[in-house]
Regions:
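Conserved interdomain hinge at the start of the Helicase C-terminal
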Residues: 188-190
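Substrate-binding/active-site clefts of carbohydrate-active enzymes
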Residues: 1-72, 92-102
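Active-site-proximal helices and loops of the catalytic beta/alpha 8
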Residues: 63-66, 70, 75, 80-165, ...
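A structural motif
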Residues: 74, 200-201
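Short glycine/proline-rich turn/loop motifs
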Residues: 41-52, 168-178, 220
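Conserved protein kinase catalytic core
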Residues: 16, 20-21, 86, 116, ...
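Hydrophobic beta-strand scaffold residues
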Residues: 4-7, 107, 202
């Protein structure tokens, strides 16, 4: 905050670790034949799926969100796997935290459902735009990128917007970094300039600004050389200076 930055927490509402204290309340979790399960349709064996039919779990979740806003003075949440959580919970939770007086809360949904905006999120991930951007670099007509941009904008409510990116924590781990996806430094910068200046809110994922080539794994340490490619870092700084001064 002293640096003029907002701080938002990554909020994982859909599931918890298997050693979470909530595990003492089995009814708070999705169960099959009496056994708590991991999220259906995934291979996420390291987490347990929460049961949003349980009113006590919902109440505890909302209370925890309020704690981080009030006690820790967080500015909002980036809500992980938002598409996996029911609309009515997001509406209930967001209505509750927005009722806190004197707070301007930032709410980002890691998802693509349009009803996230109805629930109260200001930002949705621009997944379609990202997919089309990669397609253009793989040889498809660039005109399709503008059509995708327009479609995303038309499906976004007034006063709300999409997060635009050339990578994020999932893509950098499971797909590739921008240096690989967009054919080197010039391509990575060109793709990023599109996400910055074509509309929406740009996401800069740590290490892309110094042109890291290897993927960033989820479950192991991956030191980043922050001194690499200073000219690339300078280009990102220039882009963001223009973006922030020309809303």
């Amino acid at each position: 905050h002293q640096r003029g930055m907002a701080v938002i927490l990554d909020w994982v509402a859909n599931h918890t670790a298997w050693d979470n204290p909530w595990m003492k309340y089995p009814s708070w979790y999705t169960r099959v034949n009496g056994e708590v399960i991991h999220p259906e349709g995934t291979n996420w064996q390291d987490v347990a799926d929460l049961n949003f039919d349980n009113k006590d779990m919902r109440k505890a979740m909302i209370s925890a969100m309020k704690y981080w806003l009030l006690a820790a003075n967080a500015d909002g949440f980036r809500c992980d796997a938002a598409d996996m959580v029911p609309y009515d919970f997001w509406k209930q939770a967001i209505d509750s935290i927005n009722a806190l007086s004197g707070r301007n809360i930032i709410l980002l949904a890691e998802g693509g459902r349009s009803d996230h905006f109805n629930a109260g999120f200001q930002l949705n991930y621009g997944w379609d735009f990202y997919g089309k951007l990669k397609s253009v670099w793989n040889g498809q007509a660039a005109g399709g990128l503008y059509a995708t941009h327009r479609q995303e904008q038309l499906s976004t409510q007034t006063g709300k917007t999409r997060l635009r990116f050339t990578t994020n924590h999932d893509e950098s781990a499971w797909d590739a970094t921008p240096m690989t996806l967009f054919n080197g430094q010039k391509g990575a910068l060109a793709a990023s300039s599109i996400t910055v200046f074509m509309g929406g809110v740009p996401l800069i994922y740590g290490s892309q600004e110094v042109g890291r080539i290897p993927a960033l794994p989820f479950f192991s340490n991956a030191p980043i050389d922050w001194t690499a490619n200073p000219d690339m870092l300078e280009a990102y700084q220039e882009m963001m200076a223009i973006y922030t001064s020309s809303p």
